[in-house]
Amino acid sequence: MPTDLHPDLAALAPLLGTWTGRGSGKYPTIQPFDYLEEVTFSHVGKPFLAYAQKTRAAADGKPLHAETGYLRVPQPGRLELVLAHPSGITEIEVGSYAVTGGLIEMRMSTTSIGLTPSAKEVTALARWFRIDGDELSYSVQMGAVGQPLQDHLAAVLHRQR
């Protein structure tokens, strides 16, 4: 564990670093797609982790999506995720985490979504993360543009050394 990591984050220290890998997306209103992803979790010694994510199309490398925000631990076992998307969406997700040996599992869902006037309608988001050693897998569910909450994204990433 980094010596200057805030003690509230000790259980999530294995998240720190840069992760890369491949994922796939689907939704009733779009064609299925594959993507390459890079996620970085970092810290500045305060009780939050900084989070930055970007994806590009697996087929041609064109940029697809990005998110930036903060992961907070308000109390042991609880999580708060604050994110901003360049598509005009902000979200607050609340959830929990559990650590079993070297395995970390996190589950969160939105309690608040903000939309700019030009953003597409998003009504719900939920995320599940699993960190097992140097592998991070996740799934995202989304409710948007008149569709109910359902599977949208899934990826497997590996820690970069």
Swiss-Prot record:
GO terms for molecular function: heme binding; metal ion binding; peroxynitrite isomerase activity. Binds 1 heme b group per subunit, that coordinates a highly solvent-exposed Fe(III) atom. Pathway: Nitrogen metabolism. Disulfide bonds: none annotated. Heme b binds at residue 152. Heme-binding protein able to scavenge peroxynitrite and to protect free L-tyrosine against peroxynitrite-mediated nitration, by acting as a peroxynitrite isomerase that converts peroxynitrite to nitrate. Therefore, this protein likely plays a role in peroxynitrite sensing and in the detoxification of reactive nitrogen and oxygen species (RNS and ROS, respectively). Is able to bind nitric oxide (NO) in vitro, but may act as a sensor of peroxynitrite levels in vivo. HAMAP family: nitrobindin. PANTHER family: PEROXYNITRITE ISOMERASE THAP4, THAP4 PROTEIN. Belongs to the nitrobindin family. Homodimer. This is Peroxynitrite isomerase 1.
